[in-house]
Amino acid sequence: MASLYDMMLRHSLYLEGAKKGTADEFSSSVVSDLDAVVKRAFQNINVDNFGEFTKADFNRFVADIRLRTNDVHNKNTKELMNDTKKLSRVETTLFQGMFREDTGDRLATPSNVWGSVKNSNIPATGQTFQKSANTFRNSSVGNIERLLRNGYADKLDTTDVFKSIRGVKSLGYKDGVFGKISGWGRTLASTLMSHTSSSVKDKIAPSYYDEYQWVSVLDDVTTEICWERDGEIYKMGEGPQPPAHYNCRSMTVPISPSREDIEEPDTLAEWLDGQPSEVLKDIFGDVDPSLDNVKVISLDGLRDKLDIILI
């Protein structure tokens, strides 16, 4: 049987794969829906230059786009919330399985895990799920509206305003505000999933363990707060929880009897060197094992990983 430390690190890599898949799907859906809304709105105006708008017509144009882009965000946020709710159920199953395997105890699952998770403040934002999603929505809609108002104030050509929002094909549409929104969307989804996983663990682990250790991925992009917390041991229910910031990759590992006299590796690379080949192949496929190379998996795929996590 794997040590709890090995189980938790394997799980964290599978979780990264699930986060990648969900975050990419969410951001792609948001941008695709926004693109359709903005494109349709621009096709319905009869001006070649924003200076040709009357003030009343321009305000109606902006109000229509604001309404429709808000609808896009509300629809996609609802789908993301459904994904995080599903993740909470998956993580409840996985953590119960790991903790029961490690301790031999079969304790009851805490009630209302999802309700506790969704209403808690995310350490990275200081806000609940819904408020964090609202911040993303307001930034997205506000940036689109800002470009529209700049176009009107500066009497810009309609095509130039459209390109400033959508970007240009030769640059992969990454130069427009949609490129920024895509990145913000991935960050939001990834952070909400990290918080979901961490909160589920924090809800279940105190029934089995008294303390936990903070474990950070240490590399050239590790933040100061995660460097400082790496290796620190806290009492259950009293210490900090990831995500400490947006895109946080840190995790916590309960202090378990199975970790006695185990010398833990200093780096992820050293730990990977000691893992069974079948585990590495399942996590990374045929590429070199590293955090950037974890395979994308679905939430259903994550749910099915308990057996290999326990090897």
Placement of each model-derived feature along the sequence:
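N-terminal leader/targeting and assembly helices and adjacent pre-domain segments
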Residues: 1-171, 258-311
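Acidic, glycine-rich two-metal-ion catalytic cores of nucleic acid-processing enzymes
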Residues: 162-267
